[in-house]
Amino acid sequence: MTLRIATVSLNSAVDQTVTVPGFTADAVNRVAASRIDAGGKGVNVASFLAHVGHGVAVTGLLGAENAALFARHFAATGLVDACQRLPGATRTNVKIVDPLQDQVTDLNFPGIAAGPADLDAVAATLTELLAQGLDWVALCGSLPAGIGAEAYAELAALARKGGARVALDTSGPALGLALAARPDIVKPNVAELGAHLGRTLTGLESVREAARDLAASGVGLVAVSMGAGGAVLVRGAEAVLAIPPATPIASTVGAGDAMVAGLIHAATLGLDLAETARLATAFSLGALGEIGPHLPPPERLAALARTVTVKTLPPV
């Protein structure tokens, strides 16, 4: 399979999903089920893209102590493993899923310590991958301690120089700095976008205006995820609202990452904005129906896409 996409995962994680019916804080709880998956945003986006037939490489940073879990996952999913190994263990993120109360509690651990030399190694690997003719580079997730907020801005510029389009899914200072590279896709959630713009976003109108402001800064496509409220997508003068149907949630692990993968997949298919919104939302719905960072079969994704309502929004 031809390698066309690379994801960068600087702060990968072991995703532990624990099912605890009736979870109660400050009490003894019994675990009904548990599973462990190789994860982190960049890993998840790569896995989802491979699931729908793309040739994908993952570069970034992993702790050597538990890298075998990731190596097995990469081999099983057909991903190219281009990750650097660092001393120590990749962090664990725990999601406590309570199906009775329809709640998910997140426990996110700090990432492995890294430094400028490690980022240089990732950049060198990305340069080698770009030389193979990448179409897309996805920069995903938070940054570990020791890596400066400018990391994604530098990698985005590198990807641009290498002829690739750039998708960005991060938050905080890393988001603000990377926007200078004018990525082709940016997918913040409502809270992340509001924090970046310095204002609270309440209601569809404020989200639409904020997405338009971000698009006006030079971003090709802005997709703002709003949880059960759907997503607002803005590209140029166009704006749409994707409304998902009410659906049972098995786990929220990877739902946002699935939307990023759906946006990239839609771009490779040349879909218009409405169909892009429909497909990306279907990817997110598919992940919500699975335990752990997984997608259902492609035919199920197609069926989910047909359940998504897309409304055209007036230009700002």
Curated annotation (Swiss-Prot):
Pfam families: PfkB. One of its GO terms (molecular function) is ATP binding. It catalyses: beta-D-fructose 1-phosphate + ATP = beta-D-fructose 1,6-bisphosphate + ADP + H(+). It comes from the Bacteria. GO terms for cellular component: cytosol. ATP binds at S225, M226, G227, A228, G229, G230, G256, D257. Its EC number is 2.7.1.56. Keywords: ATP-binding, Kinase, Nucleotide-binding, Transferase. Gene3D superfamilies: 3.40.1190.20. The keyword ATP-binding applies. InterPro entries: 1-PFruKinase, Carboh/pur_kinase_PfkB_CS, PfkB_dom, Ribokinase-like, Tagatose/fructose_Pkinase. The active site is at D257. Disulfide bonds: none annotated. The keyword Lipoprotein does not apply. PANTHER family: 1-PHOSPHOFRUCTOKINASE, 1-PHOSPHOFRUCTOKINASE-RELATED. Belongs to the carbohydrate kinase PfkB family. Catalyzes the ATP-dependent phosphorylation of fructose-l-phosphate to fructose-l,6-bisphosphate. This is 1-phosphofructokinase. It comes from Rhodobacter capsulatus.
